[in-house]
UniProtKB/Swiss-Prot annotation:
GO MF entry, a single one: hormone activity
Example of a GO cellular component annotation carried by this entry: extracellular space
Keyword field: Disulfide bond, Glycoprotein, Hormone, Secreted, Signal
Recorded family membership: Belongs to the meteorin family.
Subcellular location: Secreted
Keyword hit for Zinc: no
PTM (free text): N-glycosylated.
Domain of life: Eukaryota
Gene label: Metrnl
Residues in the signal sequence: 1-45
Name under which the protein is recorded: Meteorin-like protein
PANTHER family given in the database record: METEORIN-LIKE PROTEIN (PTHR28593:SF1)
Positions glycosylated per UniProt: N103
GO biological process annotation, one example: response to muscle activity
């Protein structure tokens, strides 16, 4: 029997996830049992009609007869909404243009009222918990390289699933757009000179200005930083708007993690970052005098990845 399972696994080209390493977190489903169900017809492929978003229910006859559903989405942005979750979903994300997996970054943001399932990053049978099923918690953006794996969504045991819906938005972006995602491994550390110089080239916004105020929002685990900008090098989605007094300045706000402990600071900064799910998120933000030093040094060495007007 064991040999037959492994032979079937090789033919299917897919292994079922194994348990994560030591640490807190709910256990994944029994791997051998669900592997057998998957290989013996317990999984189905669900293709979204618009290839960007998927909405399904665990109460349909087809879903109840299967432990695992495969969902295929081919788009740069969209959403997944799973009502009355039972069993598990494997969500396969791909862009609508050809691009190698190692050059793609995926960001997901759970719906605020999402509940009923845990969301894992899965690759070659290993699971890493991304989003725990905690009802009412604010959805934190999670980003990872597509090369690191795909999404495995596992329903958690519930006595009453009638009020449960698991859902999230997703975005796929090129690896260069994701260069500010060094914050995943060390979310509050300062950027290196190299990371700052690359952020200048790839960020959705690059502005020079001052911190006017900082508001901490514990229930969302974020800090909101209000900026007065005196030089707008680049922006998308109109994050910064002209000041009402027509003073040649722009006003706007960006967010960062509450755990970073951002406070109002004196002096001029260069702010960079990306817009995810309509929200401007802070990336690298060196003091402008420090940026001038590193930029001129790179310019002298001829290693600037791109140019910016320093005046």
């Amino acid at each position: 029997m064991r040999g037959a399972v492994w032979a079937a696994r090789r033919r299917a080209g897919q292994q079922w996830p194994r348990s994560p390493g030591p640490g807190p977190g709910p256990p994944p489903p029994p791997p051998l049992l669900l592997l057998l169900l998957l290989l013996l017809g317990g999984a189905s492929a669900q293709y979204s009609s618009d290839l960007c978003s998927w909405k399904g229910s665990g109460l349909t006859r087809e879903a109840r007869s299967k432990e695992v559903e495969q969902v295929y989405l081919r788009c740069s942005a969209g959403s997944v909404e799973w009502m009355y979750p039972t069993g598990a979903l494997i969500v396969n994300l791909r862009p609508n243009t050809f691009s190698p997996a190692q050059n793609l970054t995926v960001c997901i943001k759970p719906f605020r009222d999402s509940s009923g399932a845990n969301i894992y990053l899965e690759k070659t049978g290993e699971l890493r918990l991304l989003v725990r099923d905690i009802r009412g918690e604010p959805g934190q953006v999670q980003c990872f390289s597509l090369e690191q794996g795909g999404l495995f969504v596992e329903a958690t045991p519930q006595q009453d699933i009638s009020r449960r819906t698991t859902g999230f938005q997703y975005e796929l972006m090129s690896g260069q757009r994701g260069l500010d995602l060094h914050v995943l491994s060390a979310p509050c550390r300062p950027c290196s000179d190299t990371e700052v110089l690359l952020a200048i080239c790839t960020s959705d916004f690059v502005v020079r200005g001052f911190i006017e105020d900082v508001t901490h929002v514990p229930e969302q685990q974020v800090s909101v930083i209000y900026l007065r900008v005196n030089r707008l090098h680049r922006q998308k989605s109109r994050v910064f708007q002209p000041a009402p007094e027509d003073s040649g300045h722009w006003l706007g706000h960006v967010t960062t993690l509450l755990q970073c402990g951002v406070r109002p600071g004196h002096g001029e900064f260069l702010f960079t970052g990306h817009v995810h799910f309509g929200e401007a998120q802070l990336g690298c933000a060196p003091r402008f005098s420090d940026f001038q030093r590193m930029y001129r040094k790179a310019e002298e060495m001829g290693i600037n990845p791109c140019e910016i007007n320093m005046e």
